[in-house]
Amino acid sequence: MNYTVKKAWKSLHFIMRILRKGNSNTKRLAYTSLVRPILEYGAACWDPYREGQIRELDRVQKKAAKFSHHTKSPTWETLASRRKIARLCALYKAYGGERAWKAIGDRLERPHYLSRADHNLKIRNRRQRTDIGKYSFVNRTIEHWNQLPAEVLGTLPCKPNTLKKRVNKVIHVASSKMC
């Protein structure tokens, strides 16, 4: 975690030195192509759950937004929502039996009981005693998967990009209602 944040800061400071007089689109493009991939590499699986770690990652993006747009409130999608979408897409690939995710997909189980309000693609969450187990990739993602509305998952199987667009729409509608 510390290595990733340090590497992202180095890349961001490099961009800030080189593009000091560049326009905002160039700065944004440099951030999204050079810094964001560092912050998101493998983020679907190692998504941090502690507030301090999440704040460290968000500080890098806020600094880049301030540098790019000269404002404190960026209109960019938050890193947390991007990681959540990536986790849900990865679980979809495991649920669909994609070869790279087969080890996880083989261990997914349907719940013993479904209420009428639940969708039929619900996955049973595993009980864990430790924080490492509770907040692991699989358990956190299953919790979010089960909270998705039936319309998003209703027409599976579909392409991962289609699912990503649907989930993105649901997450952004939910976040706009909270504001």
Which residue ranges define each predicted feature?
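Hydrophobic/basic alpha-helical segments
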Residues: 1-179
